[in-house]
């Protein structure tokens, strides 16, 4: 009887080891470039600011993520205030640890996310500083009613105070600017 019990224990251990080996082998076959899905949060250091609504984040595994700030649209670099709006975003986040709450992936493969720095909503701050429009076309999909109202209010205040892009009499929205330009790959 002792031999039978010992054999069962050995088989149980062998099967457990085999199961673990299969599990880890399956995990190791995931591509290194596997991207976080909608609803996930990426924490990491901002290693590059491309423009007023796009940055590159490096996570703790060393993987870089191209992030498009959700619910806003900043002037293109070729537009008036484009470089100033990029520089304002860089002042806030470059080489700092942030959290990116993923809401979508855009047609260029960038993760669309709400960026937080120490709990502060950086996307809304860009709007409040007059460095971006509240991108209402997409914001309704991602924002709660309270967030939507807060962004709309931030834009209205920036406009009334003539901050950033609102210094111009009639600033051209980036989506109008892009519509008039030849289609180019996004950063």
What does each model-identified segment do?
Residues 2-19, 23-187:
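Small beta-barrel nucleic-acid-binding modules, primarily SNase/OB-fold domains
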């Amino acid at each position: 009887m002792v031999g039978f019990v010992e054999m069962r224990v050995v088989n149980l251990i062998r099967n457990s080891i085999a199961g673990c080996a299969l599990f880890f082998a399956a995990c190791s076959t995931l591509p290194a470039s596997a991207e976080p899905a909608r609803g996930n949060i990426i924490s990491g250091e901002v290693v590059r600011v491309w423009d007023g609504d796009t940055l590159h984040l490096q996570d703790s595994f060393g993987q870089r993520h191209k992030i498009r700030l959700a619910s806003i649209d900043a002037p293109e670099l070729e537009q008036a205030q484009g470089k100033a709006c990029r520089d304002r975003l860089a002042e806030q986040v470059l080489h700092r640890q942030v959290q990116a709450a993923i809401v979508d992936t855009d047609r260029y493969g960038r993760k669309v996310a709400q960026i937080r720095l120490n709990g502060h909503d950086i996307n809304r701050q860009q709007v409040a500083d007059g460095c971006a429009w509240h991108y209402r076309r997409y914001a309704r999909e991602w924002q709660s009613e309270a967030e939507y109202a807060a962004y709309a209010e931030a834009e209205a205040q920036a406009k009334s105070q003539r901050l950033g892009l609102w210094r111009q009499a009639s600033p051209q929205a980036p989506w109008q600017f892009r519509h008039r330009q030849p289609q180019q790959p996004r950063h």
